[in-house]
Amino acid sequence: MMHQGQTMMYPSVAHPIPPQLGNVNLNMASQYPQQQQNKLVAPRKSSNIKITDPNTNKEVVLGRPSPNVAAQPQQVSGVATQPMVYYTNPQQTSYNQSGTYYSGTAGVVPTGSQGRFGYPATQAGQSIPFMNPSMSNTVPASHKDNIAGPAPSGQSQLIGKPQGGLHMEKPVPSVKISMPAGRSDASKFRVADHAVQHRQKDNEVISGAMVSNKPVSEKESKAPSIPEKHSKESKAPSAVEKHPTAVTQPLPIQAAKPETDAATANSPSFLTGADEKKESLPMTDSLKDNKKNATRNDTKNLPQQPQSASPAEELKGQTSVKLGDDVVGHMETKSFDSEKVDLTSKVSGLTSATSESSISPILGKSEADSTSVNAADVPAMVISSAKLSSASTGEPQAVESLGVAAVKSKEIEITHQISPESSDGKIMSDSTENESHDFTVDLAEQASLATSKPGNSDATSFVTDPQELPKECTTSVPEDHSLMNTSHNKDTQTLSASVDASDVSEVNSGTSSESTSQSTNDKDIRSSIQETGLAVSGITPGMLPVNHSVASEGQVKHADGAKDESSTEQSSAVPTGSVRPLSREKPTAELARTKSTAGRKKKRKEMLSKADAAGSSDLYNAYKGPQEQSESVATSDGADSSSTVDGTHVLPEESEREVMCEDDGKKKVEPDDWEDAADMSTPKLQSSDSGNQASAVQLPDSDMTEANGRKKYSRDFLLTFAHQYSSLPVGIRMDTVTSTLFKDLAGKSYVIDREPHPSSARGSDRPTSRGDRRGPAMDDDKWLKSGVPYSPNRDAHMDLTNGPAINYRGGPGGAHGVLRNPRGALLVGPQSNAPQVPRSGSDADRWQQKGLIPSPVTPMQVMHKAEKKYVVGKVSDEEQAKQRQLKAILNKLTPQNFDKLFEQVKEVNIDNVSTLTGVISQIFDKALMEPTFCEMYANFCSHLAGALPDFSEDNEKITFKRLLLNKCQEEFERGEREEAEADKTEEEGEIKQTKEEREEKRVKARRRMLGNIRLIGELYKKRMLTERIMHECIKKLLGNYQNPDEENIEALCKLMSTIGEMIDHPKAKEHMDAYFDRMRNLSTSQLISSRVRFLLRDSIDLRKNKWQQRRKVDGPKKIDEVHRDAAQERHAQSSRSRGPVVSSLPRRGAPSMDYGSRGSAAPLVSPGPQQRGRGFGNQDIRYEQERHQFDRTVPLPQRSVKDEAITLGPQGGLARGMSLRGQPPVSNSELPSVVDQRRILSGPNGYNSVPSTTREDTSSRIPDRFSGRIATAAQSASSSHRPASQEGRSGNKSYSEEELREKSIATIREYYSAKDEKEVALCIEELNAPSFYPSLVSLWVNDSFERKDMERELLAKLFVGLYNGGYNLLSKPQLIEGLSSVLASLEDALSDSPRAAEYLGRLLARFVVEKILVLQDVGKLIEEGGEEPGHLVQEGIAADVLGAVLEWIRTEKGDSFLKEAKTSSNLKLEDFRPQHLKRSKLDAFMLT
């Protein structure tokens, strides 16, 4: 029956239980605990445990029966704060933890107003009896987190649920250990809620032993009630609350006061069975602690603990004894003999004032006839650790404490209770009971227990030197209390308990006075142990007899404060007060941090070498059967110094013990897969922690035999003999492992977690700092081998999160260069040379774990080796090597490196016909596929013909030319043959081909034939072939006259264009005429395509033009030629920009060049006064008709030049009749175009050249073929002076209005480029049309609206110059008329140029400023302007124009000039402003 205040909640059977609830690290294991990824562990096998006497090595028979004791109700109190519920599966199986059962209780229901840790001194409580889970194993247990209330009388019980671990455990019973009450004022305990601090790791606990200060008499122990004195003291705040919210003291180790010491002599200390007056402290089977071994490497990043004070500070005024891994490494498990042990003589009271406490693990109701204990069913009991705090700082630390079960006359009540007050199971207490130092008995973690040193049989001897206790790991243990070796003999935890320095010597008083009545016989205890499932494994014999006192030793940990040290306190319950470790499991990182003094630190190499001697992995014992376990226990007989430690003798080197203890914490390796667990279920080696078991352990050959038949021993097992043997035994090969291991470890980075301030990246509960945790059957050769490649960019701590476990597990804060494989093998330095298959991801662990059972080492299969292996670039045939070399040269052949590569060809030994034929074939192949380079390849053949010698074969002279000719004939005939084959397949249909395939084949054949024809022609030009061969080729191509083949005709045209000039000579005139007559007939035939007909016509025209091609087909050029041509183009461009020079004019037939760009306004260099020519500048591109007319009137250069003058200008243009006295006319070689205008040199009129301009288009440029004659005329021109008379002007020539418009536009555009007013004046004079001048002004002004401001400024300047610049070409009436025309079309111009009114106003203002017009004239023009008079005023355009005029005048001349102009003009601005306009530019000028 569960008390209501506990607020327990029970989930349904099918409720999925998460592995961890919230931030609390305490929870119950689910029925099937959730496994971490790649962390699957098979259930452990059970094994029987024999309890033997260490002196006689005989089995101890515990035959005293344990009467049934009725369950006593327990009053529960707590704090009604935030409840924390821990779930467990109600179904008890082999995978979950057994539940805790409570009887009905009566107490005060907790309220929210109660204090979090309210423990009234007057409260009395009752112990919770143990209920056999085997009888009622269906009731789950849950606990609330924060419950406080009246504490039980004189006792504190700590009830909690172990955390549901990820690895599978057998169900274990609850253990209740009662402890006598002591004085309430013995020591003041501080209460600290460590849950609000950093979370403690759930598997690291430090236990402190709650020791009673007063001896207990046998009579009192049997009494049903506690004496009055003790009853009063029981009302004091108890050390540990029964409820999970109960807390205990942080164990500040203080020296007991004198009055406390005095009181301890009279304090009753007894262990009763079930009465309410006994002082009990529950003990738990902490699955959380048991999980330490399995989850040291689990990927759980937990917060770090705050660092506590140094050990020196903690040891001030106190004495602590460290017990655990430091001792376990040197302790040897012992077996009991079969003889019975009188437990009555070995009962001791809890007399130590500080660290002495009696643990009476009394078995509850069970079947008394059971005679064996299954070690796998119930893990070992471990005394839960208490969180030690620094005495200097006084910080309260959470303590996970378990009470001492009460014992009453042959009954053992075991209660499995733990308090989850803190997030990780650390329990805090505010009790002031000095004798209530609590400690935890872990039923799941004990593996290897050390026995007492033989010879120490003094039942009353205690540790008397309080100063020696902190230094030593262990104290002496009596012989008659041995430890049992179980499957977890290596994974035990250290015990830590505070010892009062002043009360250590008082332990020997009254320890065994009350022990007789409470002890049970051997047989009954054994049967009870089996029935209740109590794991005797890891339990000292002192825990089985009644009232065995414990001199708990605990070395103050937290030297660096990084973590809670997982040390538990052993209650050996011996009269001598000796202390035994119950567990050995301790992380290496924790052990390293306990070494705060420099004297304890040794060299790295020494520590590593000694750490390996601590023993083999616990996986051997984890999967042993009962028989194997018994054998292991039997063979662990005979303790020596390495395993049995006498408390009175300090080991020679404490660092050696620490290193060996450190190694123990790393032996445990959990398989990552269920397959691996199955593989590991068969043990390969049976090892022990004993250092001298070489002679005792006899392993069967099957366990040590490799697949190859040789015996193989694990490295850990062999290192157990390090203390006895200095050399290896004969027949064992360790040279490879030893040299590899110690060489790498000594000289390279090796991760040892010894830093005093660990990094925050430390997240694993058991740091993987050492590489010793390997599978039991791990092959030594493969220890350092890893199939997982190391990635330098990979985070070594990436698998320390809650995500999937990756193979890389770096040491916490250690060197990142050291990684470890899934089995813990250390990856140091270069990895194995053996071929590895790199794997990553979730399958990596599974693949790597397959090697737990070593596989036979087989040599790698040798690949087949060819007799003649292939070597890249190596050619066995010499001829083939030559051909490859020649092909490489041809591939790099260019006109630029022609000479150099030809020298390389000559270096190739071409000494036979075969090589020469191959060279010719390669040249033809390159030429046919690259027709552009046929000329170069022909040149190459010409050079080869002269360089290569003649060869003789079969008395026949063979030359390069002969072979070349044969190749040409072969290729020529090949083309015909391919065409015939194509026709044949098409006609007969022997090979069915699609149309696309036939077309592709024809194209390929035609391309090859054309290349061949062109190469033949180029070879003929190099005189490599004869003329007769060329005629034969032509006849062949023209042979089929009636049904011509287009490919042949195309090849003929190509051949004619190549060799026509050479073959067309007088001797071959008849043949050539016949050829071209036939070609002329074919050009008009409709049987061939138009493309081929035009090819024929081009060939005919080419012969008429004396084989002068219209455009030169440029072939490959040298780099120098390319640079030279580019320089010539640049030079020609610059010459055209300045004006043509005689030497730079292109000759007839030269390619035309365009240098103009649209919109270019770059000024051209104005020619000198003696370089001005006459003409009208540029011709607009828009007037194509005039250009065509000009082309028709220009005679061709080859025509005979008659005596009459030749007009080079357009017909009817101004150039006609402009020659002086019948001399050759002056003309423009090229009419000005919009883009590229050239002012060509004039004739005998005295002007050498005219400037050229760049215009907007190139299409209207006159062909360059006219420049030749102009250059001739320019050479005879005189450059003396400008003639004085104007007789040269032709008054008879007149132009149409359209022509005048064109010329005027061309002139102004030329002016914008050249900026030469005189040239414009000359052009206007040439026009000789004064009536056209108003139109010219209108055209120029309208054109300026789309120009830039600079060009508009040039136009205004030009008008001023033409009006009063000495030219007198424009008059005022002409100017006003032109401006009126502009105003008439201004409204339309505004649609194209919105700022046209402003531009016009600026021009008019310029006329006013230059005094060409007065402001009154301007006003009149604006007022009367428009399509109709006054229209601009109505539209508001007049106001904009006049406002722009006035604005510009004021800007340029100032207000005074503007005012004077306004005054003189009598202009009324109001007349120009329409009434409907709200705002106008005139508004600013109307006010002044």
From Swiss-Prot:
Belongs to the eukaryotic initiation factor 4G family. The keyword Metal-binding does not apply. Residues 216-244, 274-299, 555-566, 651-671, 753-784, 990-1000, 1111-1132, 1181-1191, 1254-1267 have a biased composition (Basic and acidic residues). The keyword ATP-binding does not apply. SUPFAM superfamilies: ARM repeat. PROSITE patterns: MI (PS51366). Residues 1299-1423 form the MI domain. This is Eukaryotic translation initiation factor 4G. Disulfide bonds: none annotated. Component of the protein complex eIF4F, which is involved in the recognition of the mRNA cap, ATP-dependent unwinding of 5'-terminal secondary structure and recruitment of mRNA to the ribosome. SMART domains: MA3, MIF4G. GO terms for biological process: regulation of translation; translational initiation. Residues 978-989 have a biased composition (Acidic residues). EIF4F is a multi-subunit complex, the composition of which varies with external and internal environmental conditions. It is composed of at least EIF4A, EIF4E and EIF4G. In higher plants two isoforms of EIF4F have been identified, named isoform EIF4F and isoform EIF(iso)4F. Isoform EIF4F has subunits p220 and p26, whereas isoform EIF(iso)4F has subunits p82 and p28. Residues 883-1106 form the MIF4G domain. Residues 196-320, 337-367, 415-707, 753-795, 974-1000, 1107-1299 are annotated as: Disordered. Keywords: Initiation factor, Protein biosynthesis, Translation regulation. PANTHER family: EUKARYOTIC TRANSLATION INITIATION FACTOR 4 GAMMA, EUKARYOTIC TRANSLATION INITIATION FACTOR 4 GAMMA 2. Pfam families: MA3 (PF02847), MIF4G (PF02854). One of its GO terms (molecular function) is mRNA binding. Residues 496-520 have a biased composition (Low complexity). Residues 709-721 are annotated as: EIF4E-binding. Residues 300-310, 345-360, 448-464, 473-495, 627-646, 683-696, 1273-1294 have a biased composition (Polar residues). GO terms for cellular component: eukaryotic translation initiation factor 4F complex.
